[in-house]
């Protein structure tokens, strides 16, 4: 399900591929990891680099052809869905740390 929204911060075409930088809602920052998974407008993708609340997506031609990503522009709002396994891991670790008095 949709967890938050993000804003397309940059869009760079390189040959037939495209790299997007997405400014993520603060509520999602703890779930963003390089090579982790996220869905953008229902499209499941692998996260590239992550820095200061911005994550990068390196989109191959086939994905651009089969989805609406190629039409996204800077400033567009996108729906973010965090991978459920990532959520489970992060929230379990947080709970265990809290139970042990580690903040």
Task: Locate the predicted segments by residue.
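Conserved loop->alpha-helix
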Residues: 1-103
């Amino acid at each position: 399900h949709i967890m938050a929204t993000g804003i397309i911060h940059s869009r760079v075409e390189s040959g037939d591929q495209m790299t997007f930088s997405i400014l993520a809602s603060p509520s999602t920052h703890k779930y963003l990891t390089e090579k982790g998974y996220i869905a953008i407008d229902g499209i499941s993708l692998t996260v590239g680099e992550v820095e200061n609340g911005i994550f990068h997506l390196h989109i191959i031609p086939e994905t651009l052809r089969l989805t609406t990503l190629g039409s996204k522009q800077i400033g567009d709002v996108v729906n973010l869905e965090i991978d459920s396994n990532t959520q489970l891991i992060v929230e379990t670790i947080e709970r265990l740390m809290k139970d042990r008095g580690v903040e």
